[in-house]
């Protein structure tokens, strides 16, 4: 989702989701 706008967010989003 946010990874589309912020590639760096993908790392934070994945952690919070707890998924890859």
Curated annotation (Swiss-Prot):
Q: How is the cofactor bound?
A: Binds 1 zinc ion per subunit.
A Gene Ontology molecular function term for this protein is: metal ion binding
> Which stretch is the leader sequence?
none
List of residues binding Zn(2+): 16, 18
Record keywords: Metal-binding, Ribonucleoprotein, Ribosomal protein, RNA-binding, rRNA-binding, Zinc
| Origin: domain of life | Bacteria
Positions in coiled-coil regions: none
Q: Which cofactor does it need?
A: Zn(2+)
Mention any one GO cellular component term assigned to this protein in its UniProt record: ribosome
Regarding protein family, the annotation reads: Belongs to the bacterial ribosomal protein bL31 family. Type A subfamily.
Q: What does the UniProt record say this protein does?
A: Binds the 23S rRNA.
Quaternary structure and interacting proteins, as annotated: Part of the 50S ribosomal subunit.
Under what name is this protein listed?
A: Large ribosomal subunit protein bL31
Annotated source species: Ectopseudomonas mendocina (Pseudomonas mendocina)
Q: Which gene encodes it?
A: rpmE
